[in-house]
Amino acid sequence: MTQLVKEGFSELISNLKQVLGNENVLSSEDDLKFYSSDVFKEAMLASLVIVPNNTNQLSQAIEISTRENYCVIPRGGGLSYTDSYLPKKNNSIIVDMQKLNNIIEINEDDMFVVVEAGCTWDHLYKVLKSKNLRTPYFGALSGLFSTVGGAMSQNSIFFGSGIYGSAADQCLGLEVVLADGSIIKTGSWATPHNPSPFFRSYGPDLTGIFLSDTGALGFKTKIVIKLIPFPEFTDFLSFSFKDYKNIASSMSKVSRAGIAAECFGFDPYLQGQRLKREGLLKDLKSLANVAKSGESVLAGLKDAARVAVTGRSIFKDVPYSMHVVVDGDSKSSIQSSIEKVRAIVIPENGEEIEPSLPKIMRANPFSPPNSMLGPNGERWVPIHAIVPHSRAKKLLEVVHNFFDEKVDLLEEHKIEWGYLLATISNQGFLVEPVFFWEDSRF
């Protein structure tokens, strides 16, 4: 680094500290290494990490940084594995968004919530539940730490996705800081007269430009999400299948029927990994929450007892498992949906089993992200594809054939694999292969 460049960098740091405070401009090697890696890999080190407390600080910091030709990169909870916030150039500044974590407004009349991008799904879920409200899609499995802004940037799925789709499908409007530091709003929030962020389709869909972009096109600072009443009743089904073709067919049919808030499945290997990983302490906590989640104290205790009795042994002889969660506003509507699922799945050779897993997952939707390592500390990374239902079985066939051809290579490098399946609204089918392997320190 030349003297002139050093002086310019020192001035940049000084200017950023004036805006953000000394403690919110990080430059130690330890900090830079931590922030310059995601779940999958490390990248070249960022030049700096900055941690704004609010939108105005962020706006000023971005304007200062880009004026000096530095790339600025948003980072949420740091739980992605897609290179989205990893530096690609030497002059990069990572922006930690986690201090922008407030819930700004819960509008029960117009049924939307305004939340800052650094808020976690776990926090949002708990606050809304206390008001008997929920967002339609309500978070990824990593929602204990993953942020709303990260989900909108990555377009994540899981809880609620079977009916309501992905994270981006729930968004009504955004506040965004652009590369020059200017601040814009989208949707009906952008109108100059009595703005209210209740409606996304206000002119051209500028909201969509900033969704599913991994943060590349702007810094989402505030996000407006639809609200629905918290479901009064929930019920569960699980099924065992002998082959992947039947489970894929069943999941697609359930998805097309539009009756499952969540519809997901595991292959034998990934199912086994999940069961190995969970500890007794986690099980006890899960059982307590299963008991609390029943429609009455007695019903909750009965549910917890069934889960305790069947436990993990229910999966001992299950090749492929499919799990369904059904929400509704009455017992009769729930029962109708449950019977529709059975009518779809049983002719596909699905054998009904105790739905312990979906009960536990709904009772504790945001568990610690211990799935980011194998049960013995192995490295972990998933990849995925989303296809229309008409291509789901073919994609699984291609996946199986590919790995069958790579058996020797997988054994040589001690790589094991499995996959998660999930449906997205009526149209999408997700196949997510997951890899486990011993890294260089084993």
Q: What are the roles of these predicted feature ranges?
A:
Residues 54, 79, 111-112, 119-124, ...:
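Short, structural beta-strand-to-alpha-helix junction motif
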